[in-house]
């Protein structure tokens, strides 16, 4: 029971998880990060339900949240050296005796038949000698334990790769093709498909307990998509979300190891806010219906030539 009571404060005193910025060596993604980003994005895109677009020609519009930024994190890996280091000092009693010498001063006064003699004794204002005696033994004892990690955090700057957006767009086009849905230029499409990528990035965290430590890197992809028929302006696919995260984790004991390395891919929590519950206003008419074509605000209606091309005429 005593051992358990001692272990509980030892384990809980330094509980905490520090979340930092993923490091890019030389501005390039390291292999594990590439694997995680690809896995989460592939899983999210694969989850998209495109059955309502079977046999249609779709124009695809992908919008990705910007991921450029920078941050600093400094400090080394946790060490328990300072937590249990102790010292004991034993100094003997010390006594010092000072010797102050005395000196006499004599003054003689004479006046005719009268005379007088005055004698005084004084001490010097500084000791002429000092004697120090120590009583007892002097000793010093110390004990400590130092466990260092395999490396330190350094200041890092997050360098965004603009090709990530192109990679994600190509993944979406690949899934469309494999599902049998043709992706065409906007002028030949009968369906507009909008994909908004809200989350597409990585997060690194470190868990530090006295006995257990872990390094965790996660990649998350969260997107929302919907599809609109160009002729009728009706939703073929109501706004839906797809969210997945992949994780790489190394587990240590006293920062020795790792004794366990794991990779997982699983469904993530959905968007904090989505558009699945939005409905048109009751007074919306066909004349002021929204236009879903990009850069088409001045000419919301589709021309006859475009309609003829869609029908293959």
Curated annotation (Swiss-Prot):
Intracellular or extracellular location(s): Cell outer membrane
Chain positions covered by the region annotation Disordered: 282-313
Residue ranges with Polar residues bias: 282-298
Lipidation feature positions (S-diacylglycerol cysteine): 15
Keyword list, A-Z: Cell adhesion, Cell outer membrane, Lipoprotein, Membrane, Palmitate, Signal, Virulence
Signal peptide boundaries: 1-14
GO biological process, one term: cell adhesion
Gene Ontology, cellular component aspect: cell outer membrane
Protein's name in the database: Adhesin MafA 2/3
Source species of the chain: Neisseria gonorrhoeae (strain ATCC 700825 / FA 1090)
Superkingdom of the organism of origin: Bacteria
């Amino acid at each position: 029971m005593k051992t358990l009571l001692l272990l509980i404060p030892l384990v809980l005193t330094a509980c905490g998880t520090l979340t930092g910025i993923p490091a890019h060596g030389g501005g390039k993604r390291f292999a594990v990060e590439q694997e995680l980003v690809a896995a989460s994005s592939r899983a999210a895109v694969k989850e998209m339900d495109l059955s309502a677009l079977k046999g249609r020609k779709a124009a695809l519009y992908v919008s990705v949240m910007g991921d450029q930024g920078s941050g600093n994190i400094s400090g080394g890996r946790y060490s328990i050296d300072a937590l249990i280091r102790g010292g004991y000092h034993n100094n003997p009693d010390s006594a010092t005796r000072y010797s102050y010498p005395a000196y006499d001063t004599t003054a003689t006064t004479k006046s005719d038949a009268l005379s007088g003699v005055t004698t005084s004794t004084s001490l010097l204002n500084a000791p002429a000698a000092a004697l120090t005696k120590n009583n007892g033994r002097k000793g010093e004892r110390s004990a400590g334990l130092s466990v260092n990690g395999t490396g330190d955090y350094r200041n890092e700057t997050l360098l965004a790769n603009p090709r990530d957006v192109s990679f994600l767009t190509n993944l979406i086009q690949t899934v469309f093709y494999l599902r049998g849905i043709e992706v065409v230029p906007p002028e030949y499409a009968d369906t507009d498909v909008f994909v908004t990528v809200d989350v597409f990035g990585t997060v690194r965290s470190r868990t530090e307990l006295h006995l257990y430590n872990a390094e965790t890197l996660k990649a998350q992809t969260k997107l929302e998509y919907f599809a609109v028929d160009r002729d009728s302006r009706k939703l073929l696919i109501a706004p839906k979300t797809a969210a997945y995260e992949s994780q790489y984790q190394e587990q240590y004991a006293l920062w020795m190891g790792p004794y366990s390395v794991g990779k997982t891919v699983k469904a993530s929590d959905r968007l904090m806010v989505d558009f699945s519950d939005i409905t048109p206003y009751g007074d919306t008419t066909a004349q002021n219906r929204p236009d879903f074509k990009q850069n088409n605000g001045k000419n919301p209606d589709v021309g006859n030539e475009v309609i003829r091309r869609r029908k293959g005429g």
